[in-house]
């Protein structure tokens, strides 16, 4: 036990895209095996060498390379550096904290960034928002939050059988992913005040070219590709 370490009894952990990458190790995220994945978890403090956390505290950790270079949440107990932990708000249970998990945290950051655009541009209203990778965790929660903000949300998916699901979440329009997998124009027609992109690659390049002047893009994923072929023209 090192100075500042905290031992946590894990209650819940979520399953994320990065966990799949870690299991495959195609992205070379793990240096050696055996390894315990799980990039987030919630639980109770069982032992603490930190003045910030005491026995019985409910805590949450997300990302911070947990489950990557540090042992992850798919375990009964985890020893973690205290600076990576946050105390769980009392308004949410440990279970619900991980139902939202890293995907929920990420989608909220994206949604709040788009909402903040209205304040940055002196109240100019955001209307049309595009969400790619819409049936994934980040995309699904982003649709719910953005629609609650009153935005006209367009969801991008390659799964035609998920149209009803996306409409229930709050999407007003559905776009076939293939429409954004074509060679992007340098400057397309301005369609979007905001974009939440979880895909990357050519889909993000097309979303950039279709974003209105003064628009905002929250790019948070690379499910399709880490590469981005674009120009300075849309900026």
Segments predicted by a language model, with ranges:
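Glycine-rich beta-strand-centered segment in the early N-terminal region that forms part
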Residues: 1-14, 26-66
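Residue-level marker of beta-strand positions
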Residues: 57-58, 77, 148, 216
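N-terminal Rossmann-like NAD(P) cofactor-binding module of classical short-chain dehydrogenase/reductase
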Residues: 60, 193-196, 218
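NAD(P)H dinucleotide-binding glycine-rich loop of Rossmann-like/cofactor-binding domains
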Residues: 62-130
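Glycine-rich NAD(P) Rossmann-fold beta1-alpha1 loop
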Residues: 104-105, 133-140, 200
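Surface-exposed amphipathic alpha-helices with a cationic face
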Residues: 139-148, 212
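Adenosine-nucleotide cofactor-binding segment
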Residues: 147-203
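Glycine-rich phosphate-binding loop and adjacent beta-alpha segment
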Residues: 202-235
């Amino acid at each position: 036990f090192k100075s500042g370490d905290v031992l946590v009894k894990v209650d819940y952990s979520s399953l994320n895209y990065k966990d799949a990458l870690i299991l495959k190790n195609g992205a070379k995220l793990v240096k050696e095996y055996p390894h315990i994945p799980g990039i987030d978890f919630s639980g109770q403090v069982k032992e603490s060498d930190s003045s910030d956390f005491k026995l019985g505290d409910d805590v949450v950790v997300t990302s911070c390379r947990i489950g990557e270079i540090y042992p992850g949440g798919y375990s009964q107990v985890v020893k973690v550096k205290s600076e990576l932990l946050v105390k769980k708000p009392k308004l949410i249970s440990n279970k619900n904290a991980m139902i939202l998990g890293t995907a929920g945290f990420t989608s909220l950051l994206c949604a709040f960034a788009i909402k903040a655009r209205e304040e940055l541009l002196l109240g100019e209203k955001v209307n049309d928002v595009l969400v790619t990778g819409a049936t994934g965790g980040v995309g699904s929660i982003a649709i719910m939050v953005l629609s609650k903000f009153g935005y006209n949300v367009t969801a991008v998916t390659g799964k035609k059988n998920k149209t009803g699901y996306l409409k229930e979440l709050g999407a007003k329009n559905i776009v076939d992913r293939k429409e954004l997998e074509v060679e992007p124009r340098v400057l397309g027609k301005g369609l979007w005040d905001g974009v939440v992109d979880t895909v990357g690659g050519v889909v993000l390049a097309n979303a950039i070219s279709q974003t209105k002047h003064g628009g905002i893009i929250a790019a948070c994923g690379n499910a399709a590709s880490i590469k981005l072929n674009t120009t300075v023209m849309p900026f």
